[in-house]
Amino acid sequence: YGLRTIYPMVELIDYCEKYAKPTYWIVNYSNPAAIVAKATFRLRPHARILNICDMPVAIERNMAEILGCDRHDLEVDYFGLNHFGWFTKVRLNGTDVTEELKSYVAENGYMPKNEKSDVMHSDPSWLHTYANSRHICSAFHDYLPNTYMQYYLLGDEVVESSNPNHTRANEVMEGREKRIFDAVADYRAGKEVDLTKFFGGVHGEFIVDVAMS
């Protein structure tokens, strides 16, 4: 997986070094995030590249829906390496709401009561991932987990609930990818395009926030 991603990212860096302005920036969300970040640093240590995972921000969005507030009103303390991380504190307009969230997540996972979900994370496997957080939160009381902790701590359950004949990759190709490719085909054919098919949810918002900063 990592080897499949590293070479194209290094190639992209080389293209930018050759063709882009010296002030270029690459905002990279490719996975596996930690491996790609380490590889690009070792192979191209002077590259102007930000290797980022948006999952903590996606979880913040769900926290905001659970609390009934705007995501930007939350302030969080988070530590860890990319997907392997924990929220130690969550504050809403300065008020500590960590314990309230712990109680909720231990019972419901990161699924809001209305089950509203970001279009980028609305596939069945994502909904299962958000719900799985309740098991981790119940077992580890000190902090709120990143959803990816399920792969480290609930490995057997993840394997048992997986369908080898219809994986998360199939969900992406049949859902998000198909919506975008169909919209592009409609645009090229001169048809009216539903721009919401290009909406990236919190993932897209975070990319814009990083680029603007």
Features from the language model and the residues they span:
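A structural signal for short, well-ordered beta-strand segments and their strand-loop junctions
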Residues: 26-29, 51-52, 78
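Flexible loop/turn segments at secondary-structure boundaries
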Residues: 33-37, 59, 85
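Short acidic, glycine/serine/threonine-rich loops at helix termini
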Residues: 38-42, 62-63, 88-90
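A structural micro-motif
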Residues: 24, 47-48, 74
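Catalytic cores of large soluble enzymes that bind and process phosphate-bearing ligands
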Residues: 1-8, 51, 55, 202
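Acidic, His- and aromatic-enriched active-site or binding-groove loops in soluble protein domains
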Residues: 46-63, 67
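Rossmann-fold NAD(P)-binding glycine/threonine-rich loop
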Residues: 1-44
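Long, compositionally biased stretches enriched for glycine and/or charged residues
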Residues: 65-213
